[in-house]
Amino acid sequence: MKKIILALLLLSTFHAKAADTLYIKQPQVPILIERHDNVLLLMRLKATETKTLDNIELTLDNSLPLNQIKAIKLYYGGTDARQYDNKLRFAPVDYVTGFTPGKTLRAIPSYVVLRSELQPTTHRLTLPDKQSLFPGVNYFWVSIEMQPDVPLKATLNAAITEAIADGKALPLVDTSARNIQRRMGIGVRHAGDDGVTAYRIPGLVTTNNGTLLGVYDVRYNSSTDLQEHIDVGLSRSIDGGKTWEPMRLPLAFGDNGGLPAAQNGVGDPSILVDKTNNTCWVVAAWTHGMGNQRAWVSSKPGMDKDHTAQLVMAKSTDDGRTWSAPINLTAQLKQPEWYFFFQGPGRGITCKDGTLVFA
């Protein structure tokens, strides 16, 4: 009988704790210096008896001087659909999008309610809230905005150390991975930059001179794969990634053959630095025609551009400043019976014997 009573007590305690426990998650993604809002911590509270979240206490580690933080904000994200009541979700939507042109730098206003904002002067700070809780799941999150001169090598860790609701401390459960160190980053390309809808499929190399060269798809009209209006873009940095030069286009085919640019897409690039002489190579798939249908099913057996995708390259002998005209490798490498032949995107390597390898 004693065991049964003890089991019932434990079970009731578990349910009480689960109902009014603040669950916390810290995503392990870079903090982008140019963003006004970066998700620092996500919180979920399923309120059955709790009426108001009074405040939360945030602790920052000592790895970063506080004057390099421009703002800490507490947002309320509302609730979720009832079918997710028992799912451990931490947000109903992406509060800061990476895909909508012109909206990648700050929280989307219609998705959030700003509850408090401050510039930290101590490593332990209280964010006031006084948010009335929805009877069910409630979402909160902490945003961080950095000063523009924060070093790229800086790191940061943060934790929710206390949450007060209805005048009492809530139980806390942190679901984050252990010992997370958040690193700084720069968004080299954002949706909407230069009037482009999306940038995808990145590759990055360091030249013998220490220059960073990043390649990617420039997807002008949408994020859709080939066939579409897509060029291969390149960004260049000579200061370790702090600043980036204007975008270049190592591979672009325009209205080749009299067809529209959206039927001359080139993409899925890979980049390589020949370590023996610092020559830089970019390779990609060029698709001609195909009527804006997906290249995966529209590229057919054959060798000429009117029937099958072409494997093309461009090279730079001046550390990525300028690029050659396209070099077509299709006739040297493709078999006529193959449907679609191209390399995997990303980066290649230089072997010890000087052989250049794209996988």
For each of these PLM feature ranges, what is it?
Residues M1-D20:
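Bacterial Sec-dependent N-terminal signal peptides
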Residues A19-R182:
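Exposed, polar/acidic Ser/Thr-rich sequence context and nearby capping/turn residues
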